[in-house]
Regions:
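Surface-exposed coil loops of outer-membrane beta-barrel proteins
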Residues: 1-78, 95-108
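Charged, low-complexity intrinsically disordered terminal segments
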Residues: 78-79, 88
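Outer-membrane beta-barrel pore domains
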Residues: 84, 88-267
Length: 267
């Protein structure tokens, strides 16, 4: 869950949203305080990587199936030892180059890996009428400077973005909200909640390295303030004011957003 009207902007910029992949998953608990998930998955497609979204579009496919010439593994561990606090760590590793339907097993791309490595730590604190969440994501792409030159990216009729792709990307953010209705007995007894929240995040989808051209506009800081009103447990009405800060050569981007969401799936 998240307080903002839209998904956390940094993670939604560089990583696939609602990331579903074909594969095998094992999960379970160790005692009462530990939870684990281990997955063996189809790899991403480097042809769909781009400057503004890093690997985000690599999980999508133009077909009703996903080519799986390359594979990936993912691991997540959560700890619940402290009441009200969840601490999580996760990692992903997989190859992405030459993972398409029309692959050339004897071509130059077959000699490249395009290894995607992602590490993440996150936490949620939900106690004393406060909810505090934070996360840090860091990603690395092997053979990044060669992804732009892959066969199929530079032709005029190519459906893929011809822009360069960064070797590294980063997204981090923290948000905190306090339930105002916890101080109003009648509304609290009626299970209504009104969280007043603030959020800060920093992200960069293209951290240029080596001889790569620099694009400073991809580095952004963002703040948001707003409310989440729960008339009933599963329904939330959200409103926020946000301000995106870019480098001095670019205009900052303020915005106002309103939304209604159903959270029953995540309960």
């Amino acid at each position: 869950n998240f307080f903002t009207v839209y998904r956390p902007e940094g993670e939604a910029t560089i990583l696939p949203c609602t990331w579903h992949q074909t594969g095998i998953s094992l999960w379970g608990h160790i005692g009462q305080d530990w939870k684990y998930q281990l997955q063996f998955l189809a790899g991403l497609n480097a042809l769909s990587f781009n400057r503004d979204n890093w690997i985000k579009k690599g999980a999508s496919s133009a077909f009703e199936f996903e080519p799986a010439n390359k594979y990936a593994v993912a691991l997540r561990i959560d700890n619940y030892s402290i009441p009200g606090l969840r601490l999580g760590i996760s990692g992903y590793y997989g190859h992405s180059i030459d993972n398409s339907l029309g692959r050339d097993a004897n071509g130059t791309a077959a000699k490249l890996k395009g290894a995607v490595t992602i590490g993440s730590v996150d936490f949620t604190f939900n106690r004393f009428n406060w909810i505090v969440r934070g996360s840090f994501d860091y990603g690395h792409l092997g053979d990044a400077e060669k992804v732009q030159l892959l066969p199929g990216r530079q032709t005029k009729i190519s459906p893929f973005n011809p822009d360069p792709v960064s070797k590294t990307a980063i997204a981090t953010g923290i948000e905190a909200g306090w339930d105002l209705f916890s101080q109003i007995a009648r509304l609290h007894q009626d299970n209504q909640k009104l969280y007043i929240f603030g959020r800060y995040e920093y992200y960069n989808s293209y951290k240029a390295s080596g001889t790569q051209m620099k694009f400073p506009y991809t580095e952004k800081n963002r703040i948001a303030f707003g409310f989440n009103y729960y008339p009933i447990k599963q329904i939330v009405v959200k409103g926020e004011y946000s301000h995106r800060f870019l480098k001095s050569a670019y205009n900052n981007e303020p915005s106002v957003s309103l939304g209604v969401a159903y959270e029953g799936f995540f309960l």
